[in-house]
């Protein structure tokens, strides 16, 4: 359990960084597909 408590924040931080980066890149190349009126 101790190993999970030390690993989980690192995995979460990497996951959120990757997700944010993918969304930013997608929004840069396809700005009209992300936001529909």
UniProtKB/Swiss-Prot annotation:
Database matches in Gene3D superfamilies: Single helix bin
Key word Glycoprotein present in the record?
Answer: no
Which membrane topology term applies here?
Single-pass membrane protein
* Predominant location category: membrane
Q: Report the locations given in the UniProt record.
A: Cellular thylakoid membrane
Q: Which GO BP terms, alphabetically?
A: photosynthesis
**Its GO CC terms?**
photosystem I; plasma membrane-derived thylakoid membrane
Q: List the disulfide bonds.
A: none
UniProt keywords (A-Z) are: Membrane, Photosynthesis, Photosystem I, Thylakoid, Transmembrane, Transmembrane helix
The Swiss-Prot or TrEMBL record describes its family as follows: Belongs to the PsaJ family.
Q: What is this protein called?
A: Photosystem I reaction center subunit IX
Gene name, please? Answer: psaJ
């Amino acid at each position: 359990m101790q190993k999970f408590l030390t690993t989980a924040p690192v995995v979460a931080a990497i996951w959120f960084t990757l997700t944010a980066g993918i969304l930013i890149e997608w929004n840069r190349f396809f700005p009209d597909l992300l936001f529909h009126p």
